[in-house]
Amino acid sequence: MILLQSHSRFLLQTLLTRAQNLDKAVELDYQWIEFDDVRYHVQVTMKNPNLLLLSVSLPNPPPEAMSFDGLPLGAIEAIKTTYGTGFQILDPPRDGFSLTLKLNFSKVRPDEELLTKLASIREVVMGAPLKIIFKHLASRTVAPELDRLVAIMHRPNETFFLVPQADKVTVAFPMRFKDSVDTILATSFLKEFVEARRAAALNTAPSCSWSPTAPQELEGAPKETLSANAGFVTFVIFPRHVEGKKLDRTVWNLSTFHAYVSYHVKFSEGFMHTRMRRRVESMIQALDQAKPLEKTRSMNNKSFKRLGLNEVNHTNSK
């Protein structure tokens, strides 16, 4: 299984390149989109080469998701905690974006560790609500401001759900796919995923289950959020899964779970297409090799017609 990296590789490379060439006044203006419709924009001007603006656009949160000014609950506090005073949050952000950070290279030492953190801005922002819930779980409490059923946005117009309790947090994903082939492959993949969890080597991993219908924990969720053509996956997270360094890994793996499944579905589909092409090519080669043999056999197995005496004389006269 391949896990997605928490930092944007292109963003990290852009930041490292800029940090290594601060003595050069170079103008940058890069925009790109990564999985689940998260858009980035990096700007550096010739006028202020030590200032870098990083803007991030997140998908619009659906009504049931916890959000504040277009950002997940706790995102601003998470940014301040992660990056400290070396970064400035612009209010309002650049037009068309959910968040804009200003980095002054003359005031911040741009080492690789710091830039890797900045390249992980997606994890910091979108994982903020999960961290709030899981930090309370680690202390075996429940945040008083949370509802019994918490919805968190993770894809455009889609949410997954958490049921926080003092001793555990139940996480449920409605799995939706637009393509019918993707739906079939995802359903098969998820069943195998759940089956693999039963292996002895994974005894300490969070328990998980798959069902074609919504689990009981999602009772009370809006009906439109429970349409899942690939079923529902449920994880149960205990305090031991969010202790110490495990917290960040658990938050990232859950917030990108649908993307993780989608990646493996597309990879499997591509692998099957490759196998099919190879089989077709091998069949074509076999047919091509059979053609000369058929010609040889037809030459060796010619049938001769017996001619009459008059026909022989007529043939010889020609």
Curated annotation (Swiss-Prot):
Disruption phenotype: Distorted trichomes. Disulfide bonds: none annotated. It is found in: Cytoplasm, Cytoskeleton; Cell projection. Residues 297-318 are annotated as: Disordered. It holds the Pfam family P34-Arc. GO terms for biological process: actin filament organization; actin filament polymerization; Arp2/3 complex-mediated actin nucleation; trichome morphogenesis. InterPro entries: ARPC2, ARPC2/4. One of its GO terms (molecular function) is actin binding. Belongs to the ARPC2 family. Component of the Arp2/3 complex composed of ARP2, ARP3, ARPC1/p41-ARC, ARPC2/p34-ARC, ARPC3/p21-ARC, ARPC4/p20-ARC and ARPC5/p16-ARC. Interacts with ARPC4. This is Actin-related protein 2/3 complex subunit 2A. The lineage of its organism: Eukaryota, Viridiplantae, Streptophyta, Embryophyta, Tracheophyta.
